[in-house]
Amino acid sequence: RTIIITGCGGLLGIEFIKVLLSKGHTVIGTEISDSKINKISEMIQDVNFSCLKCDVSSEKEVVSFFKHLSGLKNFPDTLINNASITSEYLKENDLEPLSFIETSYQSWQKCMDTNLGGVFLMSKEFVKLSQELAPKKAKKIINISSIYALHGPNPKLYEDTGIKSFAAYSASKAGVIGLTKWMAGFLAPYNFTCNSIAPGGVFNNHSKIFEQALSSMIPLERMANPNDISGTVSFLCSEESNYINGQVLYVDGGYSSR
């Protein structure tokens, strides 16, 4: 398959690229900055991988991105909507998430525009061009959501950890699930399947305090590793998942079962 991965330079995105390339797929990634593109291009040097600049919250950039892809011999048949503003993203860019009452509408909207609006814009253009260029081919859309879409975070988990949860993240990821289910029904007649993955907490150099606190809430007693999530992505990209549509796959070690 030829697969698009948005936000490919993040912790999960990099792992997705690696596992999909190992399965023989061609991967086209997107990132928002030249520095991230250069970093990921140095890290992953493979003839079947390329990375292009695209802000998924910008309709102009998304349209331009797909216009470029329309000239390819093999137009992509799979879209993985992975780009999002997370607590880790805010920390990396020295943008501390504010408390609920301190959050400005502008900050709220920026998160919504990326986490939910980006899924809409990318999916819309992907569907539009797929119907023009490969209407009979089976297509897949995989949206990365979160366990916090349907399970609110436990405030006690974040006490004395230095990590903050922010409302727009949970709300936007819940919207991703709603959009996934809508697309699954309405796009099925046009040879699309649409599914969502809801990862649990993925270890990313968290403090020992946070790791232990979260692990105690998970039946498997550990946080996820990136490859725990990438295996599910690989499965949804495979032919073995062709009859799965409109589903949310929780990859959380059993956290949501409690």
Language model features: what each stretch is:
Residues I218-I229, E240:
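A conserved structural motif in NAD(P)-dependent oxidoreductases
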Residues R1-I28, M183:
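Canonical Rossmann dinucleotide-binding motif of NAD(H)/NADP(H)-dependent dehydrogenases/reductases
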Residues P97, P153, S216, S234, ...:
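Short C-terminal tail/terminal secondary-structure segment
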Residues N82-E96, G254:
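Conserved NAD(P)H cofactor-binding loop of Rossmann-fold oxidoreductase domains
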Residues F65, I80, M122-F126, S130, ...:
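Hydrophobic positions on the long internal alpha-helix
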Residues I101-Y105, K136-K137, I142-G175, T180-P189:
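Catalytic loop of short-chain dehydrogenase/reductase
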Residues K128, G185-F186, N242:
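Alpha-helical segment proximal to the catalytic Tyr-Lys
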Residues P97-L121, I142, Y169, V176, ...:
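Catalytic Tyr-X3-Lys loop
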